[in-house]
From Swiss-Prot:
TM segment ranges: 3-23, 28-48, 72-92
Location(s) in or outside the cell: Cell membrane
Species classification: Bacteria, Bacillati, Bacillota, Bacilli, Bacillales
Family (UniProt): Belongs to the CPA3 antiporters (TC 2.A.63) subunit C family.
Keywords: Antiport, Cell membrane, Ion transport, Membrane, Transmembrane, Transmembrane helix, Transport
Protein name as annotated: Putative antiporter subunit mnhC2
GO biological process terms, semicolon-separated: monoatomic ion transport
Amino acid sequence: MNLILLMVIGFLIFIGTYMILSVNLIRIVIGISIYTHAGNLIIMSMGNYSKNKVEPLIGEGSQNFVDPLLQAIVLTAIVIGFAMTAFLLVLVYRTYRVTKEDEIDVLRGDDDDANE
């Protein structure tokens, strides 16, 4: 199971890197969002079931459990990732409305303007 999860995380990182390296701003935002999902999966994979972990307050008849701290961290990361994605989408939309362009190469401008 861990090997499958590791392969999924690697695939998400590959797709995120591919999207971030494109010139389209929307693809870059989607790539950053995919990176956050891969990071959340990495954190969740750290809290897998273990035979040595037992419920802390119940002595007899206890069962294996997953660390709730990692789940709280991932929930917080999901909210932060959603807010960041929403902010970046608004920023890209505003940039498109002002410049009528959505590619990074066009938005860089001319080097002659920077020298003057």
